[in-house]
Amino acid sequence: MPSHMGHPAIKGLVKEIRIFGLACFASIGGLLFGYDQGVISGVLVMHNFAAHFPKLASDAGLQGWVVSIMTLGAMCGAFINGPISDRLSRRWSILLANIIFLIGSVIQCSAQNLSMLFVGRFIFGTGIGMLAMVCPLYLSELAPLNIRGALVALQQLSITFGIMISFWINYGTQYIGGTGVGQSAAAWRIPLAVQCFPSLILATGREEEALQVLVKMRRVPETDYRLRSEFLEIKAARMFDKQTKIEKYGENASRVYVAVQEYKELFTVSHLRKRTMVACLLQFIQQFTGINAIIYYEPQFFESIGLSGNSVNLLATGVVGIVFFLSTIPAVLYLDRWGRRKTLIYGAIGMSIAQLAVATLWAVYQDTFIIHPSAGWAACVFVWVYIGTFAFSIACVNWIMPSEMFPPGIRGKAVGLAIACNYISNFVAALVVPKMLKTIASGTFYFFLVFCIILGVWTYFCVPRRKVSEYLILRFPFRSLLMSHFSLTGVPIEEMDKLFGGNEGEADLRRIADIRTQLGVDDDNVKESFIEEIKEDNEHIEGAS
């Protein structure tokens, strides 16, 4: 029987074109995050920016703070948005995040002193963190199983697209007024202001009736039994959240008390603690493979390996953005087919080889790159190799896995905690890397190499061998029908409990089953209504193979 596990992603995305469009819209949050990651590295080396903030230009430690203060704000935003998204809904938390983001962006791009710059970047980062927490969760809950990995990978693709365009905007605006003493302040204010426009687009969405939204997304009439069942499932999910909190904490428990207890359970309940450790360790390891350290300080790095001249420097940096973006596309197309674990292992191997090469070249030619330019370009190429390998592996899996491994009742807060851990690690990396590059030079990349190796070993021994089965894709094409029986990975909730211990998933399953019975949702009837569609899909696939 021909396999189409994960569904060839292009066909799946075309079939679910409205969901794909909505996913692209929601992924603007990722574009904003990526844009800032890329734009700040170019702005830091612009002549007028250095003249405007002379203390910042001469102090590597202060540079680390101006970069990392954004990630500190993002950590706070990701942490607080867990309960906010549960309370206000995913959509309204996205809109709130964009308002906060816009305020920070305006302060940052109009900064007249370091205090304004720091405050603007912190507020801006808070909005970024809120978006980074809720967008992957929103996409994973919105998507049918067969294209879930592809849609959530769009978050990473949008990040890389933001990084790519930021480099080239920096490259273009650096010539406003010249690249020397006469350079205009617009050279760096314009790149910082550009990020306001995608945020304004994202903040203009309008509310529609839930059933009409489903009609548009699924492209079936309101009378379709599957659509009605999905609508009831959404209603069941709301009832499930309310009933779970009442059963666990009592009817009179305050929202603050419930939120505190749920965060506490992530560390005190054994099976939740194991899932939390896996989700948070993945975020921590990702940052210390070196990605954001490279993205934030690329111009300084390329200058240190002999690529002299501001234009050459920014060109080399711009290629990083292109490689990053193009290398993310295979993950969007094939991640559901490859599986998370295999992708992480292959990515760890590729990143380890690249980091070893960069570190060794720098150690050997550290003081002679000027007279050995080929060695500098070789190091540059291996940085591109690292970026490409990172992009198709942990860059995408990092956003997906935290949304997949937790029981429904606590998923929002767990994802918020995992993303907050990402930003804590990002903050530390952004803060210490400038000093590492100055003091231990090539040792910085040996440090990153160690974490690339740890990623491979940790994934091999600790990440479960699971990927979505073809049967599940055919049996449950609508996401909400699936949620009653399975976690977001496509692994039955009972099996997730076996992997991590505990029985909270099974308890959730029984609770959802009771609610479904109350609402009259009947999976057997839904299954019969799918038979003809499944036969048509199989005939199409067999004819194409």
Where do the model's predicted regions map?
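Short arginine-rich
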Residues: 219-226, 507
